[in-house]
């Protein structure tokens, strides 16, 4: 379930999946057991949704299977709490470029502005890395002490990427 992105990558995923001739392309993410749609403009409306092969070989969308058999797929307690939403998205990611600085919504913001019951809390388990343009990969997390909302807003609006990176730990 490779998902299109504006950046390139995926050679490590190709290698992990035993693909011949691993290469970086615009599908640097593998969404695992996904019931989430990518929503990238101009892409297929079902991109990101995982498909499950049934014993007879028919492929069905996991989200459709869960909606048809919610308690059998997720359990009664899960359905009572979250309905047919998984509430999690697992991605395998291999980027061949520095990813953009990202800010993820809280659940409250997502509900009010994005029509979603979920924010985007993330956890990362790094299995392998590779240099990108000669730079050893690294992850920035959170703001340095003293960075104000007004300062960061100004930097983002100016699209000053080095300054954005400079505000992060």
How would you name each of these model-derived features?
Residues 148-169:
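Active-site glycine-rich loop that binds ribose-phosphate moieties when present
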Residues 1-147:
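Transition-metal
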């Amino acid at each position: 379930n490779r998902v299109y992105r504006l950046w390139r990558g995926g050679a490590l995923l190709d290698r992990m999946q035993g693909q011949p001739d691993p290469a970086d392309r615009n599908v640097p993410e593998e969404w695992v057991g996904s019931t989430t749609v990518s929503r990238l403009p101009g892409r297929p409306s079902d991109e990101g949704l995982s498909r499950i092969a049934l014993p007879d070989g028919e492929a069905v969308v996991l989200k459709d299977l869960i909606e048809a058999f919610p308690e059998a797929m997720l359990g009664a307690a899960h359905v009572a709490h979250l309905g047919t939403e998984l509430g999690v998205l697992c991605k395998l990611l291999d980027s061949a470029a520095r990813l953009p600085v990202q800010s993820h919504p809280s659940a409250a913001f997502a509900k009010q502005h994005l029509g979603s019951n979920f924010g985007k809390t993330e956890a990362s388990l790094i299995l392998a890395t590779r240099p990108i343009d000669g730079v050893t990969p690294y992850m920035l997390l959170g703001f340095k002490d003293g960075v104000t909302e007004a300062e960061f807003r100004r930097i983002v609006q100016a699209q000053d990427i080095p300054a954005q990176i400079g505000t992060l730990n």
